Amino acid sequence: MVSVKPLKFEDDELLLLDQRKLPGKEEYFTCKTYQDVHFAIKEMVCRGAPLIGAVGAYGVALACREFINESQEKFQQETKRAISELSSARPTAVNLFWALNKMNKLLGQVMEENTAPEDIYPIILNEAHKISDQELQRNYRIAEFGDQVISNGDKILTHCNTGALATTGYGTALGVIRQAHYNHKDIFVYVDETRPRLQGAKLTAWELKQEQLPFALIPDSSAAVLIKNGDIDVIFVGADRIASNGDTANKIGTFMLSILAKKYKVPFYVVAPVSTIDFQAKNGDDITIEERSSKEVTEIDGVRVAPTDIQVYNPAFDITPAENITGIITEKGIIGPNNREIMTIQE
């Protein structure tokens, strides 16, 4: 079974496997305050929608610990500010907002009961543990459903990193692939390098190598040739936010793959927990797309590879329209990418 631990909570500190340093170094980044958590999410020490949701929850717990000696009024003000700051770390992944809303609601309940700040911290910390543990259990259920659409001998294409590193320990799209491998299916995986941050090359390849699961790393630009030549049987991708009509925001390059999949009639599955669905978003137009630093495109590991004084467009995500998606694999089953089926699984 997978041994990757993307996060640990020990001695009132959150330890995050620093994904910026993989695959070269396996080091943990220590978060002692909610500000550390904000930095870790924003600067992609940790990444992946399900994981940053859990990490955000721990950020609220650390804020409660930080202000444990304040008056109830001051405690309430500071924790509210902390939640607001944490929510600004990254705008697209809805799991972060889902987790923060859950923590904020619980905080409001315990504050209404006039609970002392020193007694609130363990309650909030326990809730963060629950969110993290439940996320892992969701991954297992997702993997069981997803394995049903993988046949022995399948050649699979995946994009970005959707494994243990993107969740609290198993994976969404990569978790489905992992489950098929554990069930002794003869599969082969093609991994997009996923520019510009190379999550496929640095993270997914690292996870698959640890699992001894047969794979090949490919340039993003070669996916079309593989699909056209009939070398891909099914495509699995993750999601950062799914609108109520099935439109899906995911790592930049996903939309391009979905167009190819539709043209060449290759099944294209989005894999995500229900917490990734934004039931308030009518369609992809309601989803904010994060734009990141130009340095992610013009530099590789700090070395300039492009001319200076040029314009750069670097969206972190794109929107795949529902009509390009075969199905959405969740912990509640495989559903169609449409409003009717999506609304039936609303929590």
Curated annotation (Swiss-Prot):
Its EC number is 5.3.1.23. Pathway: Amino-acid biosynthesis; L-methionine biosynthesis via salvage pathway; L-methionine from S-methyl-5-thio-alpha-D-ribose 1-phosphate: step 1/6. The active site is at D240. SUPFAM superfamilies: NagB/RpiA/CoA transferase-like. It catalyses: 5-(methylsulfanyl)-alpha-D-ribose 1-phosphate = 5-(methylsulfanyl)-D-ribulose 1-phosphate. The keyword Isomerase applies. Keywords: Amino-acid biosynthesis, Isomerase, Methionine biosynthesis. The record marks C160 as: Transition state stabilizer. It is an enzyme of class 5 (isomerase). Substrate binds at R47, G48, A49, R90, Q199, N250, K251. The keyword Isomerase applies. GO terms for molecular function: S-methyl-5-thioribose-1-phosphate isomerase activity. InterPro entries: IF-2B-related, IF-M1Pi, IF_2B-like_C, Initiation_fac_2B_a/b/d, M1Pi_N, NagB/RpiA_transferase-like. Pfam families: IF-2B (PF01008). GO terms for biological process: L-methionine salvage from methylthioadenosine. It comes from the Bacteria. Catalyzes the interconversion of methylthioribose-1-phosphate (MTR-1-P) into methylthioribulose-1-phosphate (MTRu-1-P). NCBIfam families: eIF-2B_rel, PRK05720.1, salvage_mtnA. Belongs to the eIF-2B alpha/beta/delta subunits family. MtnA subfamily. This is Methylthioribose-1-phosphate isomerase.
